[in-house]
Structure formats: C-alpha cells, structure tokens
Amino acid sequence: MAPDFYREAFRQAGMATTSGAAVEWTPQLALETMDAHGIAMSILSISFPGVHFGDDRAARALARRCNELAAELGQRWPGRFGAFAVLPLPEMEGALAELEFALDKLKLDGVILLASHAGRFLGDPALEPLLAELDRRSAVVLVHPGMHPSSRTLGLPWPGFMLEFVIDTSRAAINLLFSGALERFGNIKFILAHGGGVIPYISWRLSVAPIISPLVPQWPQERIFAGLRRFWYDTALCATGHALPALMQTAAPERILFGSDWPYAPAKVTGLSIEGIKEAPGVTDRLRAGIERDNALQLFPRLHG
C-alpha cells in the first residue's frame, strides 16, 4: 500500500520509485483492482524504501501511522485486506517495540522486512535480536528487496526493479541460508518476493559451492536444497513460463503464493501474471489452486474465517 501521507514522506525525503513512475493508491482503488482480477483478499504492505529516511523518531511515527491504517482497513473491509507490519529499521529498539505493538495490539498478519537495512543483509548478526523475536512468535515475514548502497554505485542507467531488486533478495536469501540463520530461527516463515530473485536459477550452483570453495559451509547438497525449500516464494513479476518451471523445481509446491506487486507494477501486470500462471508449463489445476488460494490459507489460517 502507498497512502498519501506515506508518499508525501517519501517525496520529502527526496526518494523516487525504482521504476521512475508515479504511484497512485487508495483502498477504493485497491478494491476495484482486486475485483477486476478476481482477487478476494490482499495482504497489504509498505514496500521499498520502508519508513526510515534518516530520522529515528520520524521513522517510528511513520511506521505506527502506516500500521494503524493497515489495521483500520482490515477492520473496515474484513475478508478483503490483511497486512504485514512495517518496522522502523535499522533502529532496533524502535523496531522491536513496533513489532510488539503491531502483532499484539493491532493483530497484523506478519511483518515485511527489506532484504538489507543500512547495508546489512538479513542474516547479519546485527539483525539477530529482531530475528530472535520473530522466531519466538513464529512470525510470517515477507522479504522485499531494496537498493543496497552498492547498487547505487554501479553507474547503470536502468531502474532498480529490473535487476538490482532480484539480486538484493537473492543476497539476503543466501546470507540467511549459509549464515545458519534460516536454521537457527526455524520458526520464522520467510516469504521471498519475486520468486526468490535468481535463487531458482542458481540453486544447483549454490548446492555445489561447498565442493568448490572452503569459504562456504561444508554442507551436503541436499542440506542446501532443503534450506531453499524452507522458504516460501511469491510470484510477483515472475509468473511466466520462463520462470515458474525453475521456481517449481526449487520450492516446495505448497510454498508458492500469488503476488502482484500492485500498485508499483500496474494493474495490467496483475492480469498478465494471472494468465502467466494459467499458461505456464507444468502448472496443473491443483498447483494453480495452491498458488492462487490454498497455500495462502495454509500460511494464514485466520483467512479461513
């Protein structure tokens, strides 16, 4: 979601969307888009760049306002909207406080985390206090990419969503896996946005890394493949015959979820994604039902009501 007050804070911080395009969002427009594409319910979230634009206090206030709005929308339109809480990272004290408020008081459905915060990827020891609390709560965590500081120095003219986003997610997933954080905090249900970035394509490469290099944990291939199957994956901007077969080879089939990236990706892309799932080779009716509905009901049992 991208309410007016968030977009204003975004602009005042001198930020721009990674596509360079203006974004319009209201709950009414969200419902119209959902209805037009046969979508019964959406889990809302604040995407990149999050809420921290350099001031800890302002970030706490903006996170609280976003989360309270998300809860309000869920109450106003029950059965149509859920939400992931946004946290004022990288400020850890504020993030832990907002996590408690959002999950205990507001009863939101989980948390969205950027793949990296202040240059530190998920799996970094500096972020472990947060992962420990998320693990204690068996929380659902959507991992969404951002623009790592290194991405901004490359000099490429192309919008960040085209390449840097999928690399950012992939770096976070690899760091979570090979740092051991994915196993240490095994109660967290991590969803990797955009089909896990390039992870499906390089999964075999990752599995043989211990054979090639002593710098990588010396794990057997199956342990690495099993780690990749622990993640959940959404289909935002990868719901095509090009990408889905690789994703289905990497992910557990019951851990693939429909994602749209709306409103940052226009409604036309939502329609293309729905058609892409229908037309992708190997996607049976049963698999498609899982991606479009059943797997989400497994992950979010409250949606059954």
Q: What residue ranges belong to the model's regions?
A:
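Active-site gating/metal-coordination segments in enzymes
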Residues: 44-179
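Mid-to-C-terminal alpha-helical segments outside catalytic/metal-binding sites
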Residues: 1-41, 68-76, 97-101, 188, ...
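Conserved N-terminal glycine/acidic-rich loop preference
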Residues: 140-143, 147, 167-178, 182, ...
